[in-house]
From Swiss-Prot:
Pathway terms, separated by semicolons: Sulfur metabolism; glutathione biosynthesis; glutathione from L-cysteine and L-glutamate: step 1/2
Keywords assigned by UniProt, alphabetized: ATP-binding, Glutathione biosynthesis, Ligase, Nucleotide-binding
Gene Ontology BP annotations: glutathione biosynthetic process
Organism classification: Bacteria, Pseudomonadati, Pseudomonadota, Gammaproteobacteria, Enterobacterales
Catalytic reactions of this protein: L-cysteine + L-glutamate + ATP = gamma-L-glutamyl-L-cysteine + ADP + phosphate + H(+)
Protein known as: Glutamate--cysteine ligase
Top enzyme class: ligase
TM regions (residue ranges): none
InterPro entries the record matches: Gln_synth/guanido_kin_cat_dom (IPR014746), Glu_cys_ligase (IPR007370), Glut_cys_ligase (IPR006334)
Enzyme Commission number, as recorded: 6.3.2.2
Family membership noted in the UniProt record: Belongs to the glutamate--cysteine ligase type 1 family. Type 1 subfamily.
Recorded GO CC terms: cytosol
Organism (species): Shigella boydii serotype 18 (strain CDC 3083-94 / BS512)
């Protein structure tokens, strides 16, 4: 089932320097909660400055949903320490609140208890909150409080030059974009390995369903927890953030121009379902528009092609201008065993897997094959640790045992690890392979099995509160290592100044501005 990459691996072993200079970045979301595990109802902590313009700390859907962002970094340890500094400073500046350590939200009785993220009075800030109002009215607020980790990854120019010859200009843009689309197609075919190893959301509070019926065969505990005994990541299931109306958009990952055209079409395609919500009610705007996507970011995807946007530029226009610059991996649950929600082992594994995805052949995929890849993902998400579980290839009927496929993949990853270790020194990548491959013969070692044992023991609330308390105490005590207190104070002040400048620079009323942007 795993494509034969022996030739590509042999090529890599002859060109190890092609992997020197991999760049990465991390984003981590987390809900602010009270000591009793309920959602914090306070505004964004003052010490963190403006959520609209802060370089490192912002908010996602809700005012209580923090998001930490590291700068692009070539050094794993430095990046993780930077992320830890963001957590340390925040833990010291959020009063008695703490950070929820799980992907699925804390106990929230009602969706209306969730305040949307607020970004001030500038047109841009109000637009961001209106977008969230639209998300709430389309999908429900609870679903939007699910949190995850995003891992951004780019291969060095040396890799593309070794692989494609001396490239520049439009040629480079097209060849590099084609190379990243290969990564994306392989990710859709084999990325289920990520929730298998690192999925950590096998259970939910019953309140999360809001009384809606579900076809999933949940087991229930006395304390109101619903779980699936072999599930890995309910966050990635249909309970999580998926968008049924997006499934027939037909967006594919074979070609830059095709992909962008599909995305641009989706933000112009009217939706009957969302038209029923209405645009305005009693003088209050309910969504930006009633199209399938309000804006491009609404497209749900476990992985995204990206380029840093310029001022006023949409994500797709940035891609058209310069091609794909990096890949955003979006399938990581919060790691509950790390105070910062992600650890070195995971980052090193993702490095290995992304390189493998760049090397392995990836035939073009039709939108129907793309839909078929969802079958493997769903199996792993809902019953990944079930004995005897099998996976298929695309829409074909042949089936293969998951543990065997996993071990075959790791045989290749081990060779990538040897190459990366040869240029970085040490054996850190090989060690990660040896640790993780054991999860295929012993699923009890996976994150989902480990966290489920704790949840069955003490409930989701008990587990979440215990980890949150321990991490709060730990992070508050640890000294900063890279950033200094004055860096945070300076960024707070600079972010507040930037927000003020945006607010005073606006010349037209929001309603007029919105007509041009909706």
């Amino acid at each position: 089932m795993i494509p034969d990459v022996s030739q590509a691996l042999a090529w890599l072993e002859k060109h190890p320097q092609a992997l020197k200079g991999i760049q990465r970045g991390l984003e981590r979301e987390t809900l602010r909660v009270n000591a009793d595990g309920t959602l914090a109802t306070t505004g964004h902590p003052e010490a963190l400055g403006s959520a609209l313009t802060h370089k490192w700390i912002t908010t996602d859907f809700a005012e209580a949903l923090l998001e930490f962002i590291t700068p692009v970094d070539g050094d794993i340890e430095h990046m993780l320490t930077f992320m830890r500094d963001l957590h340390r400073y925040t833990a010291r500046n959020m009063g008695d609140e703490r950070m929820w350590p799980l992907s699925m939200p804390c106990y929230i009785a009602e969706g209306q208890d969730i305040e949307l993220a607020q970004y001030g009075t500038s047109n841009t800030g109000r637009f961001k909150t209106l977008y969230r109002e639209g998300l709430k009215n389309r999908y429900g607020a609870l679903m939007q409080t699910i949190s995850g980790v995003h891992y951004n990854f780019s291969l060095p120019m040396a890799f593309w030059q070794a692989k494609c010859g001396d490239i520049s200009g439009t040629d480079a843009k097209e060849k590099i974009s084609a190379g990243y689309f290969r990564v994306i197609r392989n990710y859709y075919r084999f990325g289920w390995v990520i929730p298998y190893l690192f999925g950590a959301s096998p259970a939910i509070f019953s309140s999360f369903l809001q009384g809606k019926p579900t076809s999933l065969p949940f087991e229930k505990t006395e304390c109101g927890m619903y779980y699936l005994p072999y599930a890995t990541s309910l966050r990635l299931s249909d309970l999580g953030y998926t968008n049924k109306s997006q499934s027939n958009l037909g967006i594919t990952f074979n070609d830059l121009y095709e992909y962008v055209a599909g995305l641009k079409q989706a933000i112009k395609t009217p939706s009957e379902e969302y038209a029923k919500i209405g645009i305005e009610k009693d003088g209050k705007r309910l969504q930006i528009n009633s199209n399938v996507l309000q804006i491009e970011n609404e497209l749900y995807a476990p992985i995204r092609p990206k380029r840093v946007t310029r001022s006023g530029e949409s994500p797709s226009d940035a891609l058209l201008r310069g091609g794909i610059e990096y890949i955003e991996v979006r399938s990581l649950d919060i790691n509950p065993f790390s105070p910062i929600g992600v650890d070195e082992q995971q980052v090193r594994f993702l490095d290995l897997f992304m390189v493998w995805c760049a090397l392995a052949d990836a035939p073009e995929m039709s939108s129907s094959e793309l839909a078929c890849t969802r079958v493997n993902w769903n199996r792993v998400i809902l019953e990944g640790r079930k004995p005897g579980l099998t996976l298929g290839i695309g829409c074909e009927t042949a089936q293969f045992p998951l543990p065997q496929v996993g071990k075959d993949l790791f045989r290749d990853l081990k060779r990538v690890a040897q190459t990366l270790d040869s240029i970085n020194g040490g054996e850190a990548y090989q060690k990660v392979c040896d640790e993780l491959v054991a999860c295929f013969d012993n699923p009890d070692l996976t994150f989902s099995a480990r966290i489920l044992r704790s949840m069955i023991d003490t409930g989701i609330g008990g587990t979440g509160k215990a980890f949150a308390e321990a991490y709060r105490n730990l992070l508050r005590e640890e000294p900063l290592e890279i950033l200094r207190e004055e860096d945070f104070v300076a960024e707070r002040e600079a972010s507040e100044r930037r927000q003020q400048e945006m607010e005073t620079a606006d010349t037209e009323p929001f309603a007029v501005w919105l007509e041009k942007h909706a």
